[in-house]
C-alpha cells in the first residue's frame, strides 16, 4: 500500500476553511489531535493523536490507527483486544488542526484499555474545595488482565 502524502497547509486562512484540499496541520511534534465518537449513538469514546503515517493508514484502510506518544510508535486500535475501530466518517475542523473520527467498535464494544466503552467514564466534581473524580460508568466489557496481562 502506497503511503499518502499530505500537502503543506496553506498560510491563507480562507484556503484552509473553504478549499477542497485536505491539508492537515500537524503540531511541532508532527501530531494531530483525533476525537473519536461512536458512529451510531455519538458517544465520545476517546481522544488520541495521529502522525501523518497513522492518519494515512486510517484513511487508506478504514481502520483507526493512532500514534502512541508514550511508546513512540503507531498502533492499530483494538489489535490486541479485538476491539478494532472501523471508521465510518472522518471530519476536520475549520483550520484542519484536529480531526473527528466516527467509528464502529468491534469485539467487546469497548474503547478504553480499562475495559470500559469510553475513556471518559469519570466526571470531575468539587467536594469540600477539592477537585475529585466520580465514576459514572463502571461497566467493564472485558477484563484488562485477561487481554493485556497487566
Curated annotation (Swiss-Prot):
Cofactor: Mg(2+); Zn(2+)
Keyword entries, A-Z: Amino-acid biosynthesis, Cytoplasm, Histidine biosynthesis, Hydrolase, Magnesium, Metal-binding, Zinc
Lineage: superkingdom: Bacteria
Disulfide bonds: none
Pathway: Amino-acid biosynthesis; L-histidine biosynthesis; L-histidine from 5-phospho-alpha-D-ribose 1-diphosphate: step 3/9
Cofactor note: Binds 1 Mg(2+) ion per subunit. Binds 1 zinc ion per subunit.
Any one GO molecular function term: zinc ion binding
Catalytic activities: 1-(5-phospho-beta-D-ribosyl)-5'-AMP + H2O = 1-(5-phospho-beta-D-ribosyl)-5-[(5-phospho-beta-D-ribosylamino)methylideneamino]imidazole-4-carboxamide
Sequence positions that bind Zn(2+): 94, 112, 119
EC number(s) reported in the record: 3.5.4.19
Subcellular localization(s) per the UniProt record: Cytoplasm
A Gene Ontology biological process term: L-histidine biosynthetic process
Residues where Mg(2+) binds: 93, 95, 97
A GO CC annotation given for this chain: cytoplasm
Major localization class: cytoplasm
Pfam families given in the database record: PRA-CH
Family matches, as PANTHER family: HISTIDINE BIOSYNTHESIS BIFUNCTIONAL PROTEIN, HISTIDINE BIOSYNTHESIS BIFUNCTIONAL PROTEIN HIS7
Function: Catalyzes the hydrolysis of the adenine ring of phosphoribosyl-AMP.
Subunit and interaction comment: Homodimer.
NCBIfam families linked to this entry: PRK00051.1
Protein family per UniProt: Belongs to the PRA-CH family.
Protein's name according to its UniProt entry: Phosphoribosyl-AMP cyclohydrolase
Organism of derivation: Rhizobium etli (strain CIAT 652)
